[in-house]
């Protein structure tokens, strides 16, 4: 179920990004293939074999011998859209067209999609249309770039008025029910689900091959099938969004957070806010930013902020005087100017800083209880290994292992490496201009590339599939306007085009796949529950497809 690119196409030249294949083909045929005779099944299996697949973001595509591809994409209303299309390759460095794969229809679509980003990572042959587009030709100004999801919850890149964080927070806080996203994702489950017999058959077969059902394939005394969990590793460098993904799955599949669990995050939220204030004060000193004459705080206030050793775990609430100082500091024009200055890449500030400071009045209230969105936005360093069992449905259980991403934590991963079915590797797209906290001489994105290289080419993962989350696309889109990607990666030539930039980074990771593992890339925003719901619906389809292939059905 993957966009299966040959090794030659993956290593070709690029215009701001890698070569990939355009999606096409009718997904309904895949469902019908299951019902074909034995002879047809064998022929289908031959036509669909491919190594080193790069699987399209929210859809899963396979090359056939004829150069066509199969795709099932999710449309805006939550249904699966089908179609047949030619395999497309990326343009080369001179933006030359590949005439064999271009036709007038493709050119029309490419012209319409020139500024589109959707849930599919695709390459177009038109020299002006290197982009990541969705199946509905959504415009980047009006639609979120990574999904075909209703804009009732999600904002456009250029600042639509809807506040998605507030909307999600209100929905979850009022109902604690992940299914009520103002109609968002309606029909996704139905669209992506097979009939009961297909799902049951798949899960039994997959579980048997992985030793996850009893030897006879029997059922538990209660009549339900005994299915253990498939092992899934959440890997990636520090602050790439691994733990946030796990939090979203808890919201979607474990009824969210109890009041007690929400309260456990208070000290971490307080710590995030206080440390952000200290980071800002340090940055102002480093770059000699003077306070305004009419500022309501003084340098001595900043001295006190930097010298105080706060213990968030012992704070029942955020002290009023501290909250006032932090709010004034954040709202200073000189501070806001610093955040968009040429110095921004030279100092650390957590991704959710603006979110917490915009909500500082609420958070500093004496009876403050964190919201779901507060929890998702919280930076909480993972130390050691944490495991969580997630039921994607009644017959598919995933055992997630979340491990620390900092260098000091990586040596602990070895204990999780046996019998791994799936690796979810998280990359923060927005970290291209940042350095490691533990080594300020090492670029974070380069570090992620090194780590990804060691993972995909490790003998431990020779039989594993890799899901690549290109995360924090929202922050990446905003940062790209002000911080040139080519400043840190000189071989990138796509300028401020977010489509080319995202594909370039994907290309850098794909080039490291010497072991020819199947790679399934997804453009994600881990803080967005609806986005993660869609992505994991696609991942469920990926597991299903792989199971059917392994069993010889496809």
UniProtKB/Swiss-Prot annotation:
Region of interest (G4 motif), residue spans: 467-474
Keywords assigned by UniProt, alphabetized: GTP-binding, Hydrolase, Lipoprotein, Magnesium, Metal-binding, Myristate, Nucleotide-binding, Palmitate, Transducer
GO cellular component, one term: cytoplasm
Positions of the UniProt region annotated as G2 motif: 374-382
Lipid-binding residues (covalent, N-myristoyl glycine): 2
Region spans: G3 motif: 398-407
SUPFAM superfamilies: P-loop containing nucleoside triphosphate hydrolases, Transducin (alpha subunit), insertion domain
G-alpha domain location: 228-554
Ligand binding (GTP): 239-244, 351, 376, 382, 405, 471-472, 474, 526
Required cofactor names: Mg(2+)
GO molecular function: G protein-coupled receptor binding; G-protein beta/gamma-subunit complex binding; GTP binding; GTPase activity; metal ion binding
Origin: domain of life: Eukaryota
Compositionally skewed regions (Basic and acidic residues) per UniProt: 7-17, 28-43
G1 motif as annotated region, ranges: 231-244
One of the protein's GO biological processes: adenylate cyclase-activating G protein-coupled receptor signaling pathway
UniProt xrefs under InterPro entries: Fungi_Gprotein_alpha, Gprotein_alpha_su, GproteinA_insert, P-loop_NTPase
Disordered: annotated span: 1-139, 157-183
G5 motif, as annotated region: 524-529
Composition-biased stretches (Polar residues): 67-85
Covalent lipidation (S-palmitoyl cysteine), chain numbering: 4
UniProt: Mg(2+) binding residues: 243, 382
Family the UniProt entry places it in: Belongs to the G-alpha family.
Protein name: Guanine nucleotide-binding protein alpha-2 subunit
UniProt organism field: Kluyveromyces lactis (strain ATCC 8585 / CBS 2359 / DSM 70799 / NBRC 1267 / NRRL Y-1140 / WM37)
